[in-house]
């Protein structure tokens, strides 16, 4: 099938994916290829290159801080899925600057083409006071230096780029990876001998299975209009005491509450996140793209043993 043919699956394109060997990226590569796209996967290491090749994508060696390389890679594609990011909390400012430079390089190539540019963001911290965050909410730039990059990306619609921002739930779960916040919670529970939650544990976390998240990425590339914000959220909010309870049940550990002033001591850096009340909706995303999550829930994945805490 020739590239750019219009089929029942959408417009077949060459898509550059950064973070192609990562937790969400690798699943997204699989979904994009299944939809008929030709994927060029950015790989920094030999290990990443082998994984990208195994997924069926064309390997492009490079790094996120090699701007000339990113520009050249994007020039070989008709769209970009930018999922790669340095999540080192000790260098948040530098990571956001690197991210911005990469997005600007992609924008330079895609400007005036109408090609898609999808970048990743998050739902955490969108709404103060525990209200349910929607796609229409605008995040406060003070929450994270990365926030401004999302705004810049959406504004690229005015330059002829089909730009979109996918805000992922803070918990992107699934089998085969033991990744993310829940994996850290399970490790802490095993180390401490107790699965804990903060206070009453009624604060809620949204979640999405990685396969459902990847399907959303594919649908967005195929169908999302320019300047669109999407929420990769399958479950609006799971009470943190239920998350702790599921971890405790699987690990056969007691489940206990701890006071908020002990959260940092018990959970270390994760305490500030696990104490957040941050439910998020994806109603508008589902209506726009016809996205319907079908994969196991977070509690089902914990019960299935995907987070052994090792």
Give a label for each model feature.
Residues 41-104, 108:
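NAD(P)H-binding glycine-rich loop region in Rossmannoid oxidoreductase-like domains
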Residues 147, 173-183, 191-192, 219-230, ...:
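Glycine/proline-rich active-site loop of Rossmann-fold NAD(P)-dependent oxidoreductases
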Residues 296-310:
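Amphipathic terminal alpha-helices
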Residues 15-35:
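N-terminal Rossmann NAD(P)H-binding glycine-rich loop of SDR-like oxidoreductase domains
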Residues 38-40, 86, 98-144, 164:
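Conserved Rossmann-fold NAD(P)-dependent oxidoreductase catalytic core, especially the SDR/UDP-sugar
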Residues 11-14, 195, 214-270, 277, ...:
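Mid/C-terminal beta-alpha module of Rossmann-like enzyme folds, strongest
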Residues 187-208:
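A conserved pocket-lining segment of Rossmann-fold NAD(P)-dependent short-chain dehydrogenase/reductase
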Residues 151-175:
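Conserved beta-loop-beta element that borders a ligand/cofactor-binding pocket
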